[in-house]
């Protein structure tokens, strides 16, 4: 299957930098991947086919560095505002659409299944594929000013990069229906950071002023065992049937 290209895609780059964790009380280095479309505050970062390929390569390159952990974050105030829909008209056949979906799936799956711990620092707005990127990481911090949503249903889509399967297991089927369906159909209501934290979509919340520093310290605490994250697997919750009926 050939690569799909959006001629008008505003391409998001994925740059890697390493941070020595010794100052934070852990061994090794943290490879931080920053995704950025280079347009500062004038346009939120979005994720088209080339952008996803860039993230995929960055994950591979970061893994090859053999760091103690890998983290993904965004440019100031933005993680990612979802898939780039500007080029959706080029998807004129099923194979092209399948390519876009599978490329996102396979890229995000690397974060879920990585033997190196993966973290997402949700430093700002996370919508759609941006939220799914965060959910695919094994640990998440969120800035107190961030807003989070899965708005796909509002435009007749579903969270196609695994959010629809990850979120119910993470926060329970009833809560997932609220986030995926009810919020989308209620004028695209977004979750505030503290709401996402309460639901279990994030592990820690920090203020923007020292968000990155505290997020790195959180990574170190997880790695050295000072911080234990306990999660419930909602796969067998009794309210699956009622949640499916509501959906």
Pin down the residues of each PLM region.
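Hydrophobic/aromatic residues within transmembrane alpha-helices
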Residues: 72, 84, 133-134, 196
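Glycine-rich beta-to-alpha active-site loop
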Residues: 111-159, 183-190
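Gly/Pro- and small hydrophobic-enriched strand-loop and loop-to-helix capping segments
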Residues: 138-160, 164, 173, 200-215
